[in-house]
């Protein structure tokens, strides 16, 4: 057996993950725009855990039963930026129940033989705007969350045509075989 040295691998910088938001959720076709005026777009999987203490064990067992993902966002407000204006209008007009699609693209994971196409995940999200702030001389800032609704969809995204294509087959789950 060959022995390999442990290596760190290649660091993934934040600009290698692109985020797109559909700014016309009621339109005939999605209008995905790059979220390019946002300083942070974090991903909090928020694993939901069930704890059981079985009679035959001294220690409790914790099982991950699901997720409640949330994407905290902080960005600047710009004129003529579709994402910024979409979020501004939700807050200023006090729109409730706004749902849209959010796509997270791994620019470091291209799809073989498909130009400008990368591994991506699509999330249905509700848009929660918690604040629009700005002191004198500052760019107005928008903060809030994109709260996931339902399950993530795995697929690929073409950054030139801005189209998402769902993967042909869902990845196999880690279910026990029962044998």
Where are these regions (language model features)?
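Short, low-complexity, polar/charged sequence segments that are solvent-exposed and flexible
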Residues: 90-96, 122-126, 146-148, 164-168
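Intrinsically disordered, low-complexity terminal/linker regions enriched in Pro/Ser/Gly
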Residues: 156-179
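Short beta-strand and beta-hairpin "edge-sheet" elements
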Residues: 105-152
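Glycine-rich loops and low-complexity Gly/Arg-rich segments
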Residues: 96-101, 148-154, 169-173
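Short secondary-structure transition/capping segments
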Residues: 11-20, 148-163
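Solvent-exposed edge beta-strands and adjacent loop segments
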Residues: 2-74, 78, 127-140
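Extracellular/virion structural assembly segments
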Residues: 58-122, 157
